[in-house]
Amino acid sequence: MNKRTLIVRTVALAAVLAAGGALAQDKPLKIGVTAGPHAQIFEQVKKVAERDGLKIQVIEFSDYVQPNAALSAGDLDANSYQHKPYLDQQVKDRGYRIVPVGYTVNFPIGIYSKKVKSLAELKEGSRVGIPNDPTNGGRVLLVFQDKGLIKLRADAGLKATPLDVVDNPRKIRFVEVDAAQLPRTLDDLDASAVNTNYALPAGLNPGRDAIAQESAKSPYVNLLAVREQDKDKPWVAKLVKAYQSDEVRRFVQTEFKGAVVPGF
């Protein structure tokens, strides 16, 4: 073997090894979630994904705004905490190039109270806390409309706000509050609508404690999201497969007993 041949083969071997290294995961994927059920579920996803060679670092956030900001900035590889109406609004408002890549779970929103046992008991002028973002606030207003307590403009859609209320016989006052803070308002307000991912850590279970609950067939199934430039990368398909596995489905059904339901 002459020197030239040896050099060529050495270079070729180095290229093969480099390619193999490129296929291997150099560092864990950073996945942003909100604290509570999303974090609990992703710890199970992490175990399933690791068997497929995918390393994951779960990073918890305490609000709905930062996970998309961090993903857009490149500080996360994906996030798992929001439904499509919320993501669509964020993309519209902030110009994010973030796309959904797979469905995860649904959190039927519940309405809770320490003062009344049903929506029918709400008196004239009652104050009700709702999330201050349009998509989740709209969810609550639709529940109140479905229960016959208010009427919304015909074209209000999924992102209705208190300004879209056109008939309100009991003059219910909807108080917009950051979603994460709503469990703390129950001592002061007549009722509050709390997203399940914030309700469960606060000791509230929609199946047991809610005085009213959104239908499980609502359009608010949560999703996995990534930057648009990453959506076709191999790790994305592996991540979705891990989340939508039978093992994760069984965990959700067993752990949350209907408070959180699989959406895949």
Regions found by a protein language model. Name each.
Residues V58-A69, A156-R184:
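Short helix-initiation/N-cap motifs at beta->coil->alpha
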